[in-house]
Amino acid sequence: MQRSGTAFAASFYLKLQRIKPFMLVKPSFKKRLLLTTLLSLSATQIFASNNSEQIPIGKLPEWVIPESYDLDFKIDPAQKGYTGKTTIHLKLAQATDHIWIHGKSLTVKDVNITSAEGIKTKAKYEQASEIDGVSKIKFAKTLPAGQYQLVLDFNAAYDQQLDGIYKIEFEGKPYVMTQMEAISARQSFPSFDEPRFKTPFNIRLTIPSKYSGFANTQQTSEQIEKSGWKTLNFAQTKPLPTYLLALAVGPWQLQKGPDIGATSWRKQPIQLRGIAPDAKAEKMQHALSETPAILKTLEDYFAFGYPFDKLDLLAAPDFAAGAMENPGLITFRDYLMLLDKDSPVFFVQNSFNVNAHELAHQWFGDVVTMPWWDDLWLNESFATWMQSKITQKLHPEFNADLERITDTADAMKSDSLVSVRRIRQPILSNADIQTAFDGITYQKGAAVLNMFENYLGEEKFKQGVRNYINKHQYGNATANDLISALAEQSGQGERFTRAMKSFLDQPGVPLINTALQQEGNKVFLNVKQ
């Protein structure tokens, strides 16, 4: 997400929009957070009392590795829920009679697992912790290590809090869309809902014939079914974490965007489209017209072409986050996309800034993803910092350079509180994940990046970032990986590493006070640290 073109917009947008769905739609968040923690502990203790193995309410065990998903959804926005079938191709690194998986508020009707040799084994799905969305799948027998195909048939209600797969009504018409970040994929389909598990997805949607359906990738086929249904198949995605999966079904209207031709970084042209509620898509022309220049600026900076097979911008009539960087299907609050000649300047500037922020995520977050939420700053700090550079280059009249200064000042104010956390804060629970989307991650993280870019010089910093992206493309990387890439360019090795880690791994900032003092015809500068 992103801030706007003014100091007020920056503060307003950051604090009220990019805190993701958690605090925006749940005003009693603190009370719920406490209740969630207590219930989670109780559920864990109850389950653990009857089982020798502790419920993994943080990270799942490492001996189960998902390798790809086939997702089949039957979605009718006019109904109260949907059905689905999840097929997970996975590897068991050790013999076991069970695995742990994420699932929440799902009714799982049938489960089986098939070995690479074609031997099918029945299994049972048990909800171990409803609050944390952790489930246990027990096999009818112990399975040896090897490759398997796990199949789960399920159904679920559309979410009512704008999380996961949710339904909205707009001008009397029903729409279904998604918001998976941070951990809402688990309430949408059985999955390994952690960012370290990046796999390709094959998505198929069966929907009423009168509606349109979209996903992260281009549609490859459409099959007309009986009784007014159709099935849409989509190209396999690049390796993605579950939190970046996106779908949309309903009476959406398409608006074609400007052509984005091939470049030296990318051999294929990009299909750019706007998606909006019925009869609204024409208002997306302005946002679409700005997109090619943003994309070119990013490609030139990273020396890495836009990595996905299409680019759809969707204007959501009801969306808890400000925007979401789903590759190929970026979702925005509708007011950020639906503009006309009478739109306030604030909206126009904010539209550009948020678009730039989300497009920057296509590299930082989507191509290279943090393995765990303690490195969320790699996503959000970089997108915030990169958006400022793009805005300053393409729209200097938006005064992004001044906004950067006010953002840094705001970050330092927050960073002076006794309760302040460090940028890289240990994440041990779901509650920790949800509270990581804050000004320390966005504003302070971006300020630290800006400081070290100035220290290294723009070219050295840029080359370090390029090396980082290329080395870890379509995989996971940590702060240490980024620091290593920058340290190599610095020529200072461990000295640079210690300096950058000191700003990431402890709260606060070094404070230097200066004062001028005159004595007769002499002036003294007093410096105190």
Per-region residue spans from a language model:
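Extended, low-hydrophobicity, Ser/Thr/Pro/Gly-biased non-transmembrane segments
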Residues: 60, 89, 151-262, 286, ...
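Ligand-binding face of N-terminal immunoglobulin V-set domains in extracellular IgSF glycoproteins
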Residues: 83-104
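Bacterial N-terminal signal peptides that target proteins for export
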Residues: 24-34
